[in-house]
């Protein structure tokens, strides 16, 4: 896995912005997990060594939070077929097929992205918030998607999933951010990004 931006690079960017008079930054760091954005196992809680390990993230956080906010961003709703077991961890649509997002560009590394089962999403949020309790977290995709799982004998309705998400997110102690947020999560958000 090639590292495009290390924690040191991000720290340099933040300091450059500060010198230019830009303050109150919200820096959202993606791809920090071992394996990066596309190859990190869905369940991994390991910080990638190429980005500067956890010490580098802590140093970056300390600097940014002098006059802004810092978030570790991670996808909790979708995953590619290398990140989850499609048979046991992906959502089944009402058609009895896997719920999938197909990219319009077949040249991308993973043209198909699958939705994780609601219990996987809830477990991931809980584990991330406990393991990285000193960091604010941005849950990519969580605010944008609310879905049902029609797995035989284990179905979960959208309403039930919504209630599970609300209960779980309301228990997170650190700052929380979302992208493309649905209104039901606004009350739990310290910040939200990517508003259409």
Task: Kindly give the residue locations of the regions a language model identified.
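Carbohydrate-recognition beta-sandwich/jelly-roll modules
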Residues: 1-25
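Aromatic- and carboxylate-enriched substrate-binding clefts and catalytic-loop regions
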Residues: 24-196
């Amino acid at each position: 896995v090639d590292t495009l931006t290390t924690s040191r690079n991000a720290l340099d960017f933040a300091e450059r912005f500060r010198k230019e008079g830009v303050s109150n930054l919200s820096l959202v760091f993606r791809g920090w997990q071992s394996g990066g954005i596309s190859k990190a196992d869905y369940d991994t809680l390991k910080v990638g060594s190429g980005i500067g390990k956890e010490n580098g993230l802590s140093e970056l956080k300390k600097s940014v939070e002098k006059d802004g906010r810092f978030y570790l961003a991670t996808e909790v709703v979708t995953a590619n077929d290398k990140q989850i077991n499609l048979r046991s961890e992906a959502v089944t649509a009402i058609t009895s097929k896997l719920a999938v997002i197909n990219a319009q560009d077949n040249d991308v590394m993973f043209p198909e992205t699958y939705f994780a089962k609601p219990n996987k999403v809830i477990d991931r949020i809980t584990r991330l918030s406990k393991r990285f309790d000193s960091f604010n977290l941005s849950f990519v995709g969580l605010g944008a998607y609310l879905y049902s799982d029609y797995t035989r004998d284990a179905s979960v309705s959208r309403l039930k999933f919504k209630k599970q998400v609300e209960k779980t997110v309301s228990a997170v102690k650190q700052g929380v951010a979302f992208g493309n947020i649905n209104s039901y999560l606004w009350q739990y958000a310290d910040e939200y990004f990517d508003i259409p």
